Amino acid sequence: MHRRATPAMLVTVLLLAVLAGCSTGAPARRTPAAPAAPEPTAVATPQVAAGHAPVNPYPVGVRNLKLNRTGRALPVKIWYPAAGEIGDPARSGAAAAKGRFPVVMFSHGLGGRPDDYATLLTRWAAAGFVVAAPTFPHTSRGADNNVLDVLNQPADVSYALDQVLALDAKADDQLQGRLDADRVAAAGHSAGGVTTIGLFTANRDERLDAGVVFAGTALGVGTAFAGTAAPQLFVHGQLDKVVEYAAGKAAYDKVPWPKAMLSLPKGDHGQTMLKDKAALRVVSDTSIDFLRWSLYGDAAAKQRIPTGATRGDIATFDDHL
């Protein structure tokens, strides 16, 4: 169901519109947004039991899933750990590796598509995560660029998560018995970052154990973080002209849970962060270690994060994990 636009929402559209220049199953368990941000909670570890994080990288498989939420077409691209030889390119329809893997839902930015982020998302899958990325009906490349529709996207992600997790019990599916519904994160870039923040605030999905926000802001979704503590990693370029660094930092400052912010002094809205080889390596390694800790309970990964995040003087790291 589409959310009715209120005057407050319409005001945010004027600010969200600057983003338009950027191109780059089971019912969801949600709780209502709190009227104000909750008091900070001193949580030293994620709310996920320690698992067995992969020791070695996996080959990667890719597949597509056709979804539709009450008339909203939501094709989903899935990258997943696959069987085979390391070094092979991502293979369509490859058999999944043995094991049960955490799920990461990724949301693209305005004018973007999941494939724009394939390098990063393939690395996540190789590290032992099933990454599912919807193409949103009104904010993807070639769509009508209805910026207000970003406010409907958190519900799209929750619906897509329902359907992805249902594959775990679907007979003869590639991902049957491969998905760990108790280890789930959301991530997104730009408007996808807004979508991701919304999944922890106004549209809280309690299945989510962690979040990764790239160049995002809380415009339209607020900062009333609600529900069980879920660690958050923010990544933002300090030269971002689309979503200013200060806007991302303001949202980060409101997070009441374990959190960290990776800041790139020479980073822009996405090209440096997601395309530049040196910066991408820092971003991907930091985000992988964050996900290993928050979804697998890998304490060694948490210890690596501060050193890896600041190597090469590419980024600074504010650590409250």
Describe the predicted segments one by one.
Residues 29-105, 116, 123-127:
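Domain-level recognition of soluble alpha/beta enzyme cores
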Residues 276-321:
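Alpha/beta-hydrolase-fold serine-hydrolase catalytic core, especially in secreted/extracellular enzymes
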Residues 18-21:
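C-terminal motif of bacterial Sec signal peptides marking the signal peptidase cleavage site
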Residues 116, 147-181, 198:
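Alpha/beta-hydrolase active-site loop
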Residues 228, 234-236, 240:
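Short beta-strand/loop motif that positions the catalytic acidic residue
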Residues 243-253, 276:
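Short alpha-helix in the alpha/beta-hydrolase fold that links the catalytic acid
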Residues 23-26:
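Bacterial signal peptide processing site
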Residues 239-243, 269-270:
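Acidic catalytic loop of the alpha/beta-hydrolase fold
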